[in-house]
Amino acid sequence: MKWRVVFCVVMGVILVFSTAVADDYNPPDWRGDLGTTYAKWSFDDGTNPSGPETGWVNPFGAPTLEVTGQLPLTEWKADDLGHQGVWKFEDYIQIEIANYDIDNPIKEIWIQVTYQADSIGQGLPLEISTNPGLTSIELVDQEAVDAFYYSETYSVILSPNPSFETIFIEPRNCTAYVDQVVIDTICTVPEPASVCLLGLGGLALLRKRRA
């Protein structure tokens, strides 16, 4: 009897811990470096629009997140399949981030989303877009949190680096239930070799115009 109690307690702790880790299970290697920002939303209540959780990092002010749409298609739920604090929506999530006004050629945005949708397993049910428009996007990883929820990580590249970006997360022809969103950004400086190549490219273009 005691072993059964101990087993149940241990399994409960493992389940809670694994879910918590999965929410921010894949942070970028560069988190905390110079020129980075960080923000996380766990939707503990239905505040909308909302600021990030305590611990966010951004010298230009707190970013904001808004879940768009109206009841009954857009609705905050205190619990969904064992996940506390979830937004159900069919419209889109909009995140606005003020950022470094630096003349860099590249910005990377690292997006983690923990969610469930009725079309998971039939192609990617989420569409990620940005303003200004993204240069490239890559699905870095997708892992099952439990029998219903997944955590996905996206790497988005903007070029050149903007001082303000808006991120949109939109379901593709389905209803999504989002448990957590984590956003990291970094304004990157190219390697010296890349700078040299950019310079040579510009010089070649200048010579061509003169010719």
Language-model region placement:
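N-terminal targeting leaders for non-cytosolic proteins
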Residues: 22-86
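A short beta-strand element within beta-rich, extracytoplasmic domains
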Residues: 102-118
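Extracellular carbohydrate recognition and processing domains
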Residues: 132-160
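C-terminal membrane-anchoring or membrane-association module
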Residues: 205-211
